C-alpha cells in the first residue's frame, strides 16, 4: 500500500493537495498513473477513489477502508 507521499512522487510538478473525504463508497473504482491504481494508495488509512488535477491543484477523493 502506497502512502500519499509516494503517490505525489509520481506526479511531476508542484501541486496544492486537497483531500476530499467521500461519505459513501463510490460505485466504481479505477484509474491510475504509471501502473499505480488509485485503490492501491492509502491516505491516512483511507483508500483513494479518484484523483484529478486542475491548474496545479491535486484533488484526492478518499473513503474509509472498511
Show which residues each predicted segment covers.
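Detector for the mature cores of small, proteolytically processed
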Residues: 19-66
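N-terminal acidic leader/helix
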Residues: 2-24
Amino acid at each position: 500500500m502506497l502512502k500519499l507521499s509516494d503517490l505525489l512522487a509520481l506526479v511531476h510538478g508542484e501541486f496544492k493537495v486537497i483531500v476530499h473525504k467521500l461519505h459513501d463508497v463510490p460505485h466504481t473504482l479505477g484509474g491510475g498513473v504509471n501502473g499505480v491504481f488509485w485503490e492501491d494508495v492509502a491516505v491516512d488509512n483511507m483508500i483513494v477513489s479518484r484523483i484529478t488535477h486542475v491548474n496545479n491543484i491535486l484533488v484526492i477523493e478518499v473513503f474509509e477502508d472498511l
